[in-house]
Amino acid sequence: METKIVRKWAMPNKNTFSIKPVKDLICKYLKGKWIDPFANDSIFKDRLITNDINSAYNTNYNLDALKFLQQFDDDSVDGILFDPPYSIHQINEVYDGFGKIKQFSRYAHEIKRIIKPNGYCISFGWNTNGMPFEMKINGKKQKTGFYKEKKEILIVSHGGCHNDTLITVDQKYNSQLKNVILSEEIITEEELFNRYEEETL
């Protein structure tokens, strides 16, 4: 899969989803059951299952974001908008008194668990890393279920002293199909020959 990278210019807005190129990108993927664990005052709240730990926002749930994600069944959502306020390290300052941010890996683990095969995670951040291809879970390096190559990256420039808005679209692969692909990559000709020899003896 080749990553589609698009760069556009737009005026900044404190509500990221209201920036036209961002809004257009989200609308392109927003089909089926989508959730937003950090919804704040999202313009898409009528089209998503929303959560914000701050009860001042009119969302479906007011839970810790990790607990919100944990309540969904495996492979049960078509997509997730993942837009933590500012950086993952600054969230405590923004949500003063509302508890501690969990390690990113704990979010990523839940996100990969609940997204359906071929579903999407649209991430917002300081870089375009998005969802990791693999990470350590319980001390062991494991595949996360997302393709290594990003589906799409949108860079929205705002000019002046404003930082760009970076959006990454990751797609979860169909695990059965991916297992076949991985098997083909891993098995060498020598291993294949040895297996054939064992089966024919």
Regions found by a protein language model. Name each.
Residues M1-D46:
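S-adenosyl-L-methionine
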Residues N118-G125:
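Conserved beta-strand signature within the Rossmann-like core of class I S-adenosyl-L-methionine
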Residues F98-P117:
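A short glycine-rich, Lys/Arg-flanked "PGG" loop and its adjoining helix->strand segment in the class I
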Residues N40, Y86-S87, N127-G130:
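Short "lid" loop at the C-terminus of a central beta-strand within the Rossmann-like core
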